[in-house]
Amino acid sequence: LYLPGISSAQQPTPMQTEPAQAPAPDDGQAESSSPKAEEVPLDKIRGLVEIFHKIKQDYVEEVSDEQLLEDAMKGMLAGLDPHSNYLDGKAYQGLQDSTSGEFGGLGIEVGVEDGFIKVIAPIDDTPAARAGIQAGDLIIRLDDTPVKGIGLNQAVKKMRGKAGAPIELTIVREGEEKPLTFSIVRDVIKIRSVKSRFLEPGFLYLRVAHFQSRTGEDFRDAIQKRIEENKKPLKGVVLDLRNNPGGVLGAAVAISDAFLDEGKIVYTEGRVKDSKLDFNAKPPDLVAGAPVVVLINEGSASASEIVAGALQDQKRAVIMGRESFGKGSVQTIFPMSNDSALKLTTARYYTPSGRSIQAEGILPDIV
């Protein structure tokens, strides 16, 4: 789940959410309201410098200054939580591409678990989904490279590449005695985040595969188009968020708001002032009170859980399926001056009733 960062860099962060219900943090022009910084531990920094010089002087192989410093930054962030990390220029560009809707690769959202790469969800209509990759799979090898300990950024770099280039994934799957091997051909991933159709006259099915910067607008357009096509009030709506790994906060707020006239959607809390946000619904309810069913599973994470949690707490929808993933933290993207970026967990989000989703997930009303 992404929020814009406060940065001295001139370019805007691509994760700007433009929420209508509450002000988002300023995009690079405001002074940070972070807590007063503690004194810099100079003795520890001296120790870090000593280690740096020892490696440069005595390590068995020559290592560049750039590599050492980048690894130090990655290590600093890796010790915080699985979602905070340093994004070099290539990784940062990849993140921008994924939130804008087109990039080259396999089409899976991944995280880290016990040093391995865990599949949060395959994205609809991508090579990974067609190959049979499932939410919860643990990737243990990419081609001939074991992934344990290589870090999320390196794993993502290896999975992305030119369309047409193959890669072999070795995974461990719950219920399978032996690791499974998948040979997948990379493709240009064009994420169509919103699909819609009528299940039968008056009953609308809406599929949201990912929350991107335009998803909220596309979602509202799809509803309006189908209502005009139906020529009568809708009788019911099915919102399918299964295997939706999340994305941009503003899109989750917009989709929740589409079904609500009023009330809280979500709020975030963190240590700094700018991380504390409230998002509230505004009229109208685009489907005019038609009954709503939301489908979720273990691959529904982050922004998907915001939508499901908001509609469940506001008693606006019945949640069906299986317990969701349980990612209740917010990452802010801070662009750096060298075309890299810092992805840092800055807040946790809570449903209208005050529930934290972190590590617990949304429990469906009907299993």
Predicted regions: what they are:
Residues 348, 353-367:
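Conserved functional hotspot residues or short segments at active or partner-binding sites
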Residues 336-347:
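Short acidic, Pro/Gly- and aromatic-enriched capping/linker segments at domain boundaries
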Residues 71, 83-121:
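PDZ/PDZ-like peptide-tail recognition elements
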Residues 39-44, 48, 56-65, 118-121, ...:
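Cleft-lining beta-strand/loop regions that shape enzyme active-site pockets
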Residues 2-86, 117:
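Terminal targeting/pro-maturation regions of precursor/exported proteins
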